[in-house]
Amino acid sequence: RISERYGLGREFGKTVLGEKLRRKIGLVSAALQQKLYPEDSAFEIVLSGAFASIGLYESPSQSVREKAVALLEEFGSIRYADRRYETLSQGEKQKVLIARALMADPELLILDEPVTGLDFIAREQVLDTVEQIAKKDSAPSMLYVTHHAEEILPAFSQTLLLKKGEVFALGKTREMMSGEVLSEFFDMPVQAVWTEDRPYLSKKKTANLNV
């Protein structure tokens, strides 16, 4: 359990400092985006990830700067590295946040609804970035939070379904994203169709028994 007020938590039965946890966990979320300084450049935002800080208060070493450049190049974001964060599109902002989250080589990367509000092209570009990370041998464990099944990439082998704040089901993604399980989950007939190893849901039509 984490105490945001005191920056303390419990890890493996021991009390740890919030900063220690922050360096082990990379986070991409709407809440984090709102805390960032909009006048900072994309490059500065990414650099701040090395220090788990909001804003840049330390002078980054050459190796840290080179790593930030490498991540921006890898995600196709280097062309707007010097632009103010507030001027970026939502999709560009998300890719910058992902690069920021990877600066400290986290053991866990949490992606909390990273493509919410994006159009189709921007959504797929961000998802391509996520898949690109997952394919690396050095990839961190990833926790992807979403309300939309079509965002579930082949890289996510396990799926946990939450309903009213409680665990409804946990298992292999193929099993969880089945019409049978999801019909019970949504309390309505659901059909799941897999395309390119991703599930797409629709309401299953039932025969009209009225005469």
PLM feature segments, named:
Residues 47, 62-80:
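Conserved ABC ATPase "signature" region
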